C-alpha cells in the first residue's frame, strides 16, 4: 500500500487531483497502481460518501468496507439494474439446486443401503436355516442309532425269567437260559435233517 512518504499520491487523491496528505483516509486502501478501483467507487458512491463512511468505522473494519464497496461498484457498472443482487440471486439459485441434488443423492444412497441390509439379512437367514436343517438331521440319526442300540429289558430277553437288577449273576443266568433255549432247537433241526438208511 502506498503512503504519503513515497511522494506518490494514492489513487483517490490522484483521481481527485489533490495533494495526498499523511492522514489521507484513502491511501491505505487505494494504492497508486489501482486507479480503476477508486474510479468505480467514486462513480457509484461518491468520494465524499466514502470518506464519511470510512471515518465512522474503526480502522480494523475499513479494509473490508472498501473491498465491499469496490465489489458492489464493479457489479453495478456491469449490471446497472440488478448490480450485485443479480449475482447473489444466481448464487442462491445454484445453492438451492445443489441442495436438491444432494438430497436426491442421499435418498438414493439410503435405498441402496437398505437393499444391502435386506440382502445380508436374507443371506444370514438362509445360513441359519441350513444350519438348523443339518442339526435336525444329525439329531434324527443319533436318535435312530440309540433306538436300535438300547432295547428294553423285556424285549431283549423275550419274556424269560430274568432276575431283577443289574448284577452280574443275573446277566449270567439270563445268558444260560437263552443258550438252553436254543440248543434243543438246534438238535431238533439236526434230527429233522438226518437221512434214513433204506436198508
Curated annotation (Swiss-Prot):
Expressed in young shoots, roots, stems, leaves, flowers and adaxial domains of cotyledonary and leaves primordia. The gene is AS2. Homo- and heterodimer with AS1. Interacts with AS1. Part of the AS1 repressor complex composed of AS1, LBD6/AS2 and HDA6. Interacts with LFR. It is found in: Nucleus. This is Protein ASYMMETRIC LEAVES 2. It comes from Arabidopsis thaliana (Mouse-ear cress). Its main location: nucleus. Disruption phenotype: Plants are indistinguishable from that of wild-type at 16 degrees Celsius, however they generate a weak phenotype of pointed leaves at 22 degrees Celsius which become narrower at 26 degrees Celsius. In the leaves of plants grown at 26 degrees Celsius, the xylems are located on the adaxial sides and the phloems are on the abaxial sides, similar to those in the wild-type. Plants with double mutations in this protein and in RH10 or AS1 protein have abaxialized filamentous and trumpet-like leaves with loss of the adaxial domain at high temperatures. Gain-of-function mutants iso1-D and iso-2D (T-DNA tagging) show completely curled up hyponastic rosette leaves. Belongs to the LOB domain-containing protein family. Pfam families: LOB. GO terms for biological process: adaxial/abaxial axis specification; petal development; polarity specification of adaxial/abaxial axis; proximal/distal pattern formation; specification of symmetry. Keywords: Developmental protein, Nucleus, Repressor, Stress response. Residues 8-109 form the LOB domain. Negative regulator of cell proliferation in the adaxial side of leaves. Regulates the formation of a symmetric lamina and the establishment of venation. Positively regulates LATERAL ORGAN BOUNDARIES (LOB) within the shoot apex, and the class III HD-ZIP genes REV, PHB, and PHV. Interacts directly with ASYMMETRIC LEAVES 1 (AS1) to repress the knox homeobox genes KNAT1, KNAT2, and KNAT6 and the abaxial determinants ARF3, KAN2 and YAB5. May act in parallel with the RDR6-SGS3-AGO7 pathway, an endogenous RNA silencing pathway, to regulate the leaf morphogenesis. InterPro entries: LOB. GO terms for cellular component: nucleoplasm; nucleus. Induction: Negatively regulated by SHOOT MERISTEMLESS (STM).
Amino acid at each position: 500500500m502506498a503512503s504519503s512518504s513515497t511522494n506518490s499520491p494514492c489513487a483517490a487523491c490522484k483521481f481527485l487531483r489533490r495533494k495526498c496528505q499523511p492522514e489521507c483516509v484513502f491511501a491505505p486502501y487505494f494504492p497508486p497502481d489501482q486507479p480503476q478501483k477508486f474510479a468505480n467507487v467514486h462513480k457509484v458512491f461518491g468520494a465524499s460518501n466514502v470518506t464519511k463512511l470510512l471515518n465512522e468505522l474503526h480502522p480494523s473494519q475499513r479494509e473490508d468496507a472498501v473491498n465491499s464497496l469496490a465489489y458492489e461498484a464493479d457489479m453495478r457498472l456491469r449490471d446497472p439494474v440488478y448490480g450485485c443482487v443479480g449475482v447473489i440471486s444466481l448464487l442462491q439459485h445454484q445453492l438451492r439446486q445443489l441442495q436438491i441434488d444432494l438430497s436426491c443423492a442421499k435418498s438414493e444412497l439410503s435405498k441402496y443401503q437398505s437393499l444391502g441390509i435386506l440382502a445380508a439379512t436374507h443371506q444370514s437367514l438362509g445360513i441359519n436355516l441350513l444350519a438348523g436343517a443339518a442339526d435336525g438331521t444329525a439329531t434324527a440319526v443319533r436318535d435312530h442309532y440309540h433306538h436300535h442300540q438300547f432295547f428294553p429289558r423285556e424285549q431283549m430277553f423275550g419274556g424269560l425269567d430274568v432276575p431283577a437288577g443289574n448284577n452280574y449273576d443275573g446277566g449270567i443266568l439270563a445268558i444260560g437260559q437263552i443258550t438252553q433255549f436254543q440248543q434243543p432247537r438246534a438238535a431238533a433241526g439236526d434230527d429233522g435233517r438226518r437221512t434214513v438208511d433204506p436198508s
